[in-house]
């Protein structure tokens, strides 16, 4: 694959668009689609949006791996998001547009960041990082001016992306899509488990201090910083040392100091360093199918969230879950990374 260096600019733009896109979707859901007295409608919106935005990503990823045209798909996804959020459409039409638009955008961003990575993780971490900030801003900032600003910025950055020359010059022919290697399948299933665990922990690891909307936005900021930092750190010291350094420290922080704001924030940063690592390792399993690889791991975030929601509802013990989850995630990433290193 031959890549123009200006692709770096596009990934930076897509990272900021990630914040805007997730912010637009969160604002539209919480300040429009959820505004009803019917609990049934709220449940339909919740399940419908997350099914479209997350569970459809492997399908869109596979299709885009086959047809390409990332820049066109990016433009279409942003138009769908703007129309679905800024225009007075019916509830379910808006739901469809922002759900599908969100899924398509994430696949495009994932593919571009993987194109650029070239065995580096920093740009994967950069793209995925700001989504958490967008979700928090869209959820907890209630003024309509927030949506207007996000939409205008999305149109500006989207236009810049659209009119930039396509940076991907040559892409090698893709082999047929198949997973017949049992060892590779085992690694993929383990990575899916690791991502599911991260989603469960994101739902269950709540602070023991008062979490005002402002504090929740700051927590999201540190989660974003952790994703970006994970990619940068792994490029310097490797995946193995990154998880051996960050995950045990996050376990200590979450286990003993959830009532301390500053240690909780630092632990959140450390725990989220694993996101670009799992994406990188997954792409090594699905070489040439970057979109499907990215979409597969993204799709299980919703499943993990539901499991975490059930865990909280049943009031099951948190500290046991914390210890098992972090230790298991640590060993999964170490195991899969060792398999990837041996195959190179």
Predicted regions and their residues:
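Helix-loop boundary and gating motifs at the non-cytosolic
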Residues: 2-50, 197-210, 309
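Central cavity-lining transmembrane alpha-helices of secondary-active solute carriers
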Residues: 43-64, 217-229
């Amino acid at each position: 694959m031959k890549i123009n260096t200006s692709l770096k600019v596009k990934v930076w733009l897509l990272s900021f668009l990630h914040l805007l896109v997730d912010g637009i979707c969160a604002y539209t859901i919480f300040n429009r689609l959820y505004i009803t007295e019917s609990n049934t409608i709220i449940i339909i919106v919740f399940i419908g949006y997350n099914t479209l935005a997350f569970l459809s990503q492997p399908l869109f990823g596979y299709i885009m791996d086959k047809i390409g045209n990332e820049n066109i798909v990016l433009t279409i996804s942003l138009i769908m998001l703007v129309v679905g959020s800024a225009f007075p459409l019916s509830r379910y039409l808006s739901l469809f547009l922002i759900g599908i638009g969100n899924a398509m955008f994430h696949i495009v961003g994932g593919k571009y960041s993987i194109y650029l990575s070239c065995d580096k993780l920093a740009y994967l971490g950069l793209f995925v990082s700001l989504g958490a900030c967008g979700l928090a801003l869209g959820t907890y900032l209630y003024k309509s001016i927030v949506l207007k600003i996000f939409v205008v910025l999305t149109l500006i950055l989207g236009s810049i992306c659209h009119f930039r020359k396509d940076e991907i010059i040559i892409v090698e022919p893709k082999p047929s899509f198949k997973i017949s290697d049992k060892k590779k399948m085992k690694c993929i299933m383990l990575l899916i488990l690791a991502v599911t665990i991260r989603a469960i922990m994101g739902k269950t690891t709540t602070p023991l201090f008062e979490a005002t909307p402002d504090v929740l936005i700051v927590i999201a900021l540190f989660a974003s910083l952790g994703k970006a930092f994970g990619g940068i750190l792994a490029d310097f010291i490797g995946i193995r040392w990154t998880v051996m350094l960050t995950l045990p420290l996050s376990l200590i922080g979450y286990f003993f100091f959830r009532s301390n704001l500053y240690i909780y924030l630092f632990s959140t940063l450390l725990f989220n360093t694993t996101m670009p690592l799992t994406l990188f390792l997954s792409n090594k399993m699905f070489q040439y199918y970057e979109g499907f690889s990215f979409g597969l791991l993204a799709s299980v975030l919703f499943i993990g969230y539901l499991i975490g929601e059930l865990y909280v509802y049943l009031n099951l013990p948190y500290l046991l879950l914390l210890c098992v989850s972090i230790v298991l995630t640590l060993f999964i990433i170490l195991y899969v990374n060792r398999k990837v290193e041996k195959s190179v």
